[in-house]
């Protein structure tokens, strides 16, 4: 990023944080909300500060035998075809490209892929298409490919994702460091322009990668290598394949959280990193119902895998620390809001209520300050995501925790977004 743009982002962040500190200390002081505000501000400064120091890996990638694995279930036909075409267009050669249909009831997509592969023989010689007779879940679809490949590196791609031509080449630059066992790229919403929800989702994605994963990458411990675009060394996948397929939680089979599960396997071996120059666009839910189902799945995966991460406190304290921070921030927010509503409601006046809403808005702007350069107009929508986060996603997160044993994970029966 040019020095002028980075300076503008840093100065804007300092300005917003200064206002946030003033509002928090002046109006809420040492109350529960005030204490939460201090911890939140500290956490924001740490994450944003680390993200400002982040630099992508450079150099020419080594020679690897790479296999791409694309699981699909009831996917839109054109979307899956575009995914395949984007993988075929990679500047770094792929030895194999596996497309595994996981027992879809709608076979339009896999039929279109088979027709394309049979027609475009010259460019599809390394494409292997497989139809499973029974729907067993994303993990088993991926495992079918993993078991049949002798690749050094596995590239995982979701079936609704367009990866940029140099995405794989950029990701592999991180593997020049032999201590890196998994890497993920930068993700944005392909259908960002569809409606307000997709715009807000794109803002969130940009923060999740450009800030959160950038900060975690600086410590060598990103918590989730995202399904749309990630690479893993063979040593991460093959020795853990049976564990991956048959993972259980509280005595029940696990059918989600595959990305974080694989990332945890990589963390056991070494570093997990983010490569900002490896980019992809993916379809995101544009209806609130589908969006909330997706978030419910992610929340349950977050809590389940967080337990595993915290257990690493002796072997990998940084991973445990990042996880503890996320869990504590969630719990403190619930306590602070509860205290505000039930203990301090009588003391609330219009000025404090306005200040509280202002804090929500400013926190949202702080979190997404990187987006100011990318999409200035959309950046101003950040406070709307702050409201969505506080009044919808946080209660949903609490619901997900309370129903974590429920095996109805919210998977859609039609077009499934595997995340």
UniProtKB/Swiss-Prot annotation:
CDD domains, alphabetized: CESA_like
Subcellular location: Cell membrane
Matching Pfam families: Glycos_transf_2
Protein name (record): Hyaluronan synthase
N-terminal signal peptide: none
GO terms (BP aspect): extracellular matrix assembly; hyaluronan biosynthetic process
Gene name of the record: hasA
GO CC annotations on file: plasma membrane
Superkingdom of origin organism: Bacteria
Pathway: Glycan biosynthesis; hyaluronan biosynthesis
Function statement: Glycosaminoglycan synthesis. The hyaluronic acid capsule is involved in the pathogenicity of group A Streptococci; it may be the major virulence determinant.
Transmembrane segments: 8-28, 33-53, 318-338, 345-365, 376-396
The keyword Isomerase appears for this protein: no
Disulfide bonds: none
EC number: 2.4.1.212
Organism of derivation: Streptococcus pyogenes serotype M1
Molecular function, one GO term: hyaluronan synthase activity
Family label: Belongs to the NodC/HAS family.
Swiss-Prot/TrEMBL cofactor(s): Mg(2+)
PANTHER family: HYALURONAN SYNTHASE, MANNURONAN SYNTHASE
Top class in the EC scheme: transferase
Recorded topology in the membrane: Multi-pass membrane protein
Catalytic activity: [hyaluronan](n) + UDP-N-acetyl-alpha-D-glucosamine = N-acetyl-beta-D-glucosaminyl-(1->4)-[hyaluronan](n) + UDP + H(+); N-acetyl-beta-D-glucosaminyl-(1->4)-[hyaluronan](n) + UDP-alpha-D-glucuronate = [hyaluronan](n+1) + UDP + H(+)
Keyword DNA damage part of the UniProt annotation: no
Keywords recorded for this protein, A-Z: Capsule biogenesis/degradation, Cell membrane, Glycosyltransferase, Membrane, Transferase, Transmembrane, Transmembrane helix, Virulence
């Amino acid at each position: 990023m040019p020095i002028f743009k980075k300076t503008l982002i840093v100065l804007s962040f300092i300005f917003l944080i200064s206002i946030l500190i003033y509002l928090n200390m002046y109006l809420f002081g040492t109350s529960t909300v005030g204490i939460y505000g201090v911890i939140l501000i500290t956490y924001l400064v740490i994450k944003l500060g680390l993200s400002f120091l982040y630099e992508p890996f450079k150099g020419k990638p080594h020679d690897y035998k790479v296999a791409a694995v694309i699981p699909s279930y009831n996917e839109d036909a054109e979307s899956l075809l575009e995914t395949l075409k984007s993988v075929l267009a990679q500047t770094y050669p792929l030895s194999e490209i596996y497309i595994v249909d996981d027992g879809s009831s709608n076979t339009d997509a896999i039929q279109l892929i088979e027709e394309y592969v049979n027609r475009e023989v010259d460019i599809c010689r390394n494409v292997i298409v497989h139809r499973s007779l029974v729907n067993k879940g994303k993990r088993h679809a991926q495992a079918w490919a993993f078991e049949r490949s002798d690749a050094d590196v596995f590239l995982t791609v979701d079936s609704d994702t367009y990866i940029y031509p140099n995405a794989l080449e950029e990701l592999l630059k991180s593997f020049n460091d032999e201590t890196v066992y998994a890497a993920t790229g930068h993700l944005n919403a392909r259908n960002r322009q569809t409606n307000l929800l997709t715009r807000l989702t794109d803002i969130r994605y940009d923060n999740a990668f450009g800030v959160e994963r950038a900060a975690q990458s600086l410590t060598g411990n990103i918590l989730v290598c995202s399904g749309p675009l990630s690479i893993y060394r063979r040593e991460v996948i093959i020795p853990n394949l049976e564990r991956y397929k048959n993972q259980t939680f509280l005595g029940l089979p696990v059918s989600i959280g595959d990305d974080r599960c694989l990332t945890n396997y990589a963390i056991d071996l070494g570093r997990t990193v983010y490569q900002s120059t490896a980019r992809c666009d993916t379809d995101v839910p544009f209806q609130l119902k589908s969006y909330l189902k997706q978030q419910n799945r992610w929340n349950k995966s977050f809590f389940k895998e967080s337990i595993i991460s915290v257990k690493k406190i002796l072997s990998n304290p940084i991973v445990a620390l990042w996880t503890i921070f996320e869990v504590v921030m969630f719990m403190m927010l619930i306590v602070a809001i509860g205290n505000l509503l039930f203990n301090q409601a009588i003391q609330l006046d219009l000025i404090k209520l306005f200040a509280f809403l202002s804090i929500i808005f400013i926190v949202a702007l702080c979190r997404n300050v990187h987006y100011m350069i990318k999409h200035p107009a959309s950046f101003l929508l950040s406070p709307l995501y702050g409201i969505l986060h506080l009044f919808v996603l946080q209660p949903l997160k609490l619901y997900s925790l309370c129903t974590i044993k429920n095996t109805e994970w919210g998977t859609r029966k039609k077009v499934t977004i595997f995340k």
